[in-house]
Regions:
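Membrane-interface transmembrane helices that cradle and orient dolichyl/undecaprenyl
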Residues: 31-34, 44-45, 84-100, 209, ...
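Transmembrane-lumen/periplasm boundary regions of multi-pass, lipid-linked membrane glycan transferases
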Residues: 121-219, 237
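Hydrophobic/aromatic-rich transmembrane helices and adjacent perimembrane loops
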Residues: 230-233, 242-270
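Short helix- or helix-capping micro-motifs
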Residues: 51-62, 107, 111, 125
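Short acidic/glycine- and proline-prone juxtamembrane loop motifs at membrane-interface regions
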Residues: 63-77
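Specific aromatic-rich, kink-prone transmembrane helix
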Residues: 25, 76-93, 99-107, 257-260
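Membrane-proximal, lumen/periplasm-facing interface regions of secretory-pathway glyco-
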Residues: 247, 269-321, 330-353, 369-408, ...
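Transmembrane-helix motifs of polytopic, lipid-linked glycan transferases
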Residues: 13-40, 83
Length: 431
């Protein structure tokens, strides 16, 4: 970020900002929905408090609460889905049809954030085709202009894939080819358990109840929400029949689900939010102070986030200065590159051939770090091991998150090529 540089604070600054703006958009969307429907007259009489429900519920989910702090692709994705819902609600409230351009912008930038944005956008397309109100819109140029805006926003991602063998589309789309029906109950259980955890248990129940109430409504916006929710749910369930659905994939639905809570009359939504906030506090407290000593297997905050600055400091002390640090796993390479001072980091993996970073020549020497959790040795076709050194541990408050083997290695040549295209010299973090 412009004011904090490449620091943890700078990288995470836009998380809370986007969550705050997205919350305002969601509350305004709820207000417009309430004001446009006589069916909600009783609820609307409670005014602004009722419209606040979606914003409070969304921010009480563990996924969104933590997402504002740790910054994942889901953070901008949730914001753009909130912007999309706000834009559509303005259209259905009789505002200028130029809001379709903002719908297209939201859809395109949401896709750039994470490809799962296509699912609720496909739900919007289904609503346009399946309902009379939607087909009336299709007779005007505005939805088509919005689609053009979306395509323009998506164009850089598509162009990059077109010039790089469609690699990211094949990787993400290739998941649909996974098929292990014998593990269906395991995958379904993981999908259900993941949502109960990321939404928080009572908010998950609240989402289910909200969809039940949506099914009873006949107004345009309720039908639109149903399309944007049920179509992606059907895709996730179908995928879970034969393959794993990552717990964070359905987070794309959380803005629409939170908005649906407006039509739930029960007061226990406050208790649901309180439980979600309590879970958030517990997770953040564990990440910061680790009051409960858990193994990395059970403590995700320790396993993924614990002790990185101290670990890299230990690496720099124990490995000779002015030598190359090497990682053959992209997560470790990224952490080393972010925290290391005045030292080059070389990443080695097939994915790096698709990036515009400088490559290394074969024969280069350096120190390879590998997690002991991988339970294997460095690939002998890629590296010549010259020596092995004592492991270096990454820990937080004396709890060991992981241990890393340290090898002095030389990059092997692949065929007759002098340059190793599967390597990348990562840019130094200038803080």
């Amino acid at each position: 970020m412009f004011f904090a540089g490449d620091t943890a604070e700078g990288l995470r600054f836009m998380g809370p900002v986007s969550a705050a703006i997205g919350t305002v958009l969601l509350v305004q969307t709820a207000q417009q929905w309430l004001q446009s429907q006589k069916l909600f007259a009783e609820s609307a009489s409670s005014g602004f408090v009722t419209a606040l429900k979606p914003g409070i519920v969304l921010n009480s989910t563990l996924a969104v609460g933590l997402g504002t702090l740790i910054m994942t692709p889901d953070t901008p994705l949730v914001f753009f889905m909130a912007l999309l819902l706000w834009s559509v609600s303005n259209l259905l409230s009789g505002k200028h049809p130029a809001f379709w351009l903002l719908v297209g912008l939201s859809a395109g930038l949401g896709f750039d954030s994470k490809y799962t944005a296509l699912l609720p956008v496909a739900g919007l397309g289904m609503w346009l085709l399946a309902t009379r109100a939607g087909r009336q819109w299709l007779r005007t140029p505005w939805p088509w202009l919005g689609a053009m805006v979306a395509v323009i926003c998506m164009a850089p991602v598509v162009e990059w894939n077109a010039t790089h063998h469609w690699v990211s589309f094949l990787k993400q789309g290739g998941r649909a080819g996974d098929w292990q029906p014998a593990r269906m109950f395991t995958f379904m259980g993981e999908l259900l358990g993941g949502q109960i955890g990321l939404a928080s248990p009572l908010i998950f129940v609240l989402f289910v109840v909200a969809v039940k109430y949506l099914l009873r409504l006949r107004d345009q916006f309720a039908q639109l929400l149903l399309c944007m929710i049920l179509l992606p749910v059907a895709v996730f369930v179908q995928h879970a029949i034969g393959a794993r659905v990552q717990a964070n994939w359905p987070v794309v639905l959380y803005p629409a689900l939170a908005l649906s809570v407006v039509c739930v009359p029960y007061r226990w939504w406050k208790a649901a939010c309180a439980l979600g906030v309590a879970m958030f506090i517990v997770v953040v407290g564990q990440a910061l102070w680790a009051p409960v000593h858990l193994s990395p297997h059970f403590d995700m905050t320790l396993r993924q986030m614990g002790g990185w600055p101290e670990f890299v400091e230990s690496v720099e002390k124990q490995i000779p200065p002015d030598t190359l640090l090497i990682a053959d796993e992209y997560g470790l390479a990224g952490e080393l590159s972010f925290y290391v001072q005045n030292r080059k980091v070389l990443a080695v993996e097939p994915r790096w051939q698709f990036f515009a970073f400088p490559h290394s020549t074969c024969g280069a020497e350096g120190y390879l770090l590998r997690s002991r959790r991988r339970h294997d040795q460095p690939d002998p076709t890629l590296f010549d091991i010259l020596a092995q050194y004592p492991d270096i541990s990454r820990s937080r408050h004396s709890a060991v998150a992981d241990s890393y083997a340290v090898y002095h290695i030389r990059l092997r040549c692949l065929g007759n090529a002098e340059m190793r295209e599967d390597t990348a010299i990562l840019p130094a973090n200038k803080r």
